[in-house]
C-alpha cells in the first residue's frame, strides 16, 4: 500500500506549481482565448469551436474533481491567479498594442 501511495505521489510531480495535466491544458486555453477574441479561422463552421469548448469543459471538470480529492480549499486557487490574470488580460494587451501601432506609429511612417 505504501508503494502504491509513493508511486501516486511521484506521478503527480509539479513544475513551478503547475501539474503535468495543467501544462497540457495551457495550449488549449490559449487557443480558446484567441479564438473567442478574434473569431475562429473558419467562422462559418461552429463544430471546431464546439469541440474545443467541450474539451475545455472536460479539462475544467477534471480540475474540479482533482481539487475535491485534495481538499485544500482556497490555498489551491492562489497559484492560478497569475494564469487567470494572464488569460484575461492577454487579448486586451494584444488589441491595445495593435490599436496603438495603428493609430500612433503608422501615420508617421506614411508621411
Curated annotation (Swiss-Prot):
Cellular component GO terms, alphabetical: membrane
Membrane topology per record: Single-pass membrane protein
Per its UniProt entry, which superkingdom is the organism in? Eukaryota
User: Keyword set for this entry?
Assistant: Membrane, Transmembrane, Transmembrane helix
Kindly report the protein's main subcellular placement as a broad class: membrane
Localization per record: Membrane
* Name of the protein this chain belongs to: Putative uncharacterized protein C12C2.14c
Amino acid at each position: 500500500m505504501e508503494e502504491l501511495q509513493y508511486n501516486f505521489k511521484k506521478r503527480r510531480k509539479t513544475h513551478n506549481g503547475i501539474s503535468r495535466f495543467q501544462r497540457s491544458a495551457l495550449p488549449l486555453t490559449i487557443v480558446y482565448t484567441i479564438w473567442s477574441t478574434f473569431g475562429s479561422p473558419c467562422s462559418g463552421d461552429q463544430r471546431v469551436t464546439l469541440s474545443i469548448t467541450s474539451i475545455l469543459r472536460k479539462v475544467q471538470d477534471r480540475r474540479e474533481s482533482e481539487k475535491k480529492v485534495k481538499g485544500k480549499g482556497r490555498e489551491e486557487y492562489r497559484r492560478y491567479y497569475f494564469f487567470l490574470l494572464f488569460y484575461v488580460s492577454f487579448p486586451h494587451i494584444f488589441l491595445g498594442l495593435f490599436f496603438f501601432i495603428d493609430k500612433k506609429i503608422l501615420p508617421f511612417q506614411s508621411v
